[in-house]
Design a protein with these regions (language model features):
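Small/polar, glycine/serine/threonine/aspartate-rich low-complexity segments that form flexible
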Residues: 24-33, 79-112, 240-247, 281, ...
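Periplasmic alpha-helical coiled-coil/stalk elements that build and connect Gram-negative outer-membrane
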Residues: 35, 144-260, 375, 379
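Bacterial N-terminal signal peptides
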Residues: 9-19
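Sec/SRP-type N-terminal targeting helices
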Residues: 52-56, 69, 100, 114-142, ...
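Bacterial N-terminal signal peptides that target proteins for export
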Residues: 1-11
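Short segments within alpha-helical structural elements
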Residues: 206-228, 390-448
């Protein structure tokens, strides 16, 4: 991530469990023991396969910039040729003589483009600006990876708490089963009530097994989002009390954060529009004449077979056959079947398309902020309602427990009250971690900070 981004809000610090200061580089995370959200994201941003296309694209920008610079240098070419000729020639005395021989030619030539309508200059300027902004390509991918891993990580935290609720549910059912068994033995309840309770315990065991399976699946999703495919590489996610998470969220709200940054996706859209303007100028350079400078040196050696024509020595021929050339070439476009005009129009259409994409990206950023704000407010309201619901359900179960012990209600009514409490706790946990994830998203959209 680029250096100008602000630090992580304090509401995320305990969740991330950062152990190093901002001045100390973070060590390479290893897949062992407990891994915090920060470590999971750091690992994913170094090992995710999503980084491969971004790195290739960044390398392509470097190659394009180097190629644009090299276009200002002259061309240098060397050539060598060997020819053989056979036949007769007629001299001044009307006599035919054999003219069989060979010729060897050597040449070195160079050319330099002096003016091309500014095409090379615009290409260089475009490639340099693209290269200077290459970090945003990596930032965009890293941010997407971080948001994905954060969502998966929060999913694991929620799944862990759901398992605890399922275990509590089973524990209550087992306790109730013992009481029902005792009442059946005492003749206070029919044996059918005992069978009903056993059925309920079996259902609660199944619910616990499903909760553990969901936790295992959530861990697998997190591993895949981190780029981990080897089954032997294991780690765990530390559990945290939901109320401690809410306490931190209450201390710092992202609502008042000023959007003082620009999303990498928006910067890339702006860059594509700026570069498209250079493409239009490069295309219009095709209307301009082209001036080039060329020069060269050539030499040759001739050898005649036979005695009819005497051969000069190799050294004498090199002294007398050498030739230097230098010249200017001006090419003025007159008619090229409308190719330049078509290229200009195509470049202008691409610029209009890039402008449309930029406007769409700007709208998308504002839309994300608006919806993220609404989602967080909804999550906060759901949290408050679900918390009140848990308190009411717990109070109801306590009262039901007393009435059941007094013999005023049946085991079925007690079971109904217990199920309402378990359902209320599940909704409460869902609201807690939904609020946490919504807070992470809104903080990112407003400030660009992400768990690192």
């Amino acid at each position: 991530m680029i250096a100008h981004r602000p630090f992580i809000p304090t509401l995320l610090l305990p969740l991330l469990a950062l152990t190093a200061t901002a001045q100390v580089p973070e060590a390479e995370p290893t897949l062992s023991g407990e891994m915090t959200l920060s470590q999971c994201i750091t690992y994913a941003q170094r090992h995710s396969p999503d980084l491969i296309p971004a790195r290739v694209q960044m390398e392509q920008l470097e190659v394009q910039e180097e190629s644009a610079r090299m276009n200002f240098l002259p061309d240098l070419n060397a050539g060598v040729g060997q020819n053989f000729s056979f036949g007769y020639t007629q001299g001044h005395d009307k006599v035919l003589r054999k003219n069989n021989g060979s010729s060897t030619g050597l040449s070195v030539s160079t050319s330099l483009s002096l003016f091309e309508g500014g095409a090379r200059w615009w290409a260089l300027k475009s490639s340099r600006e693209a290269l200077e902004s290459k970090d945003y390509i990596l930032d965009e991918v890293e941010d997407r990876i971080a948001l994905t891993v954060a969502s998966s990580y929060v999913g694991v935290l929620l799944a862990q708490q759901i398992v605890e609720v399922a275990e509590e549910n089973l524990s209550l059912s087992l306790m109730q089963q013992k009481r029902v068994d005792a009442q059946v033995e005492a003749g206070k309840l029919a044996p059918s009530e005992q069978l009903k309770m056993r059925t309920q315990v079996g259902q609660d065991r199944l619910a616990l097994n499903e909760a553990k399976s969901d936790l295992d699946r959530a861990m697998r999703v997190l591993r895949l989002d981190m780029g981990i495919t080897e089954e032997g590489e294991t780690f765990t996610v530390p559990q945290e009390d939901p109320e401690s998470v809410i306490a931190r969220l209450e201390r710092e709200s992202p609502y008042h954060a000023a959007p003082e940054w620009t999303n990498p996706s928006l910067r890339l859209a702006q860059l594509r529009y700026d570069l498209s303007s250079y493409d239009v100028k490069r295309a219009k350079a095709g209307y301009m004449p082209r001036l080039s400078l060329s020069g060269g040196y050539s030499n040759g050696y001739f050898y005649y077979f036979g005695d009819e024509i005497p051969n000069k020595s190799f050294g004498d021929q090199l002294k007398s056959n050498g030739q230097y050339t230098i010249g200017l070439s001006l090419s003025i476009p007159i008619f090229n079947r409308g190719q330049v005009r078509a290229s200009v129009r195509q470049a202008e259409l691409q610029r209009e398309s890039a402008l449309g994409q930029l406007i769409q990206q700007q709208f998308s950023e504002q839309r994300n902020i608006t919806l993220a704000t609404a989602d967080l407010r909804k999550a906060e309201e759901s949290y408050r309602l679900s918390k009140d619901n848990v308190e009411v359900a717990q109070e109801s179960l306590d009262m039901t427990e007393k009435e059941y012990n007094a013999g005023r209600i049946t085991a079925y009514e007690w079971e109904q009250s217990k199920n309402k409490l378990i359902g209320a706790k599940s909704q409460y946990l869902q609201s807690v971690y939904t609020r946490l994830l919504r807070s992470i998203n809104l903080t990112y959209y407003l400030t660009g900070t992400l768990p690192r």
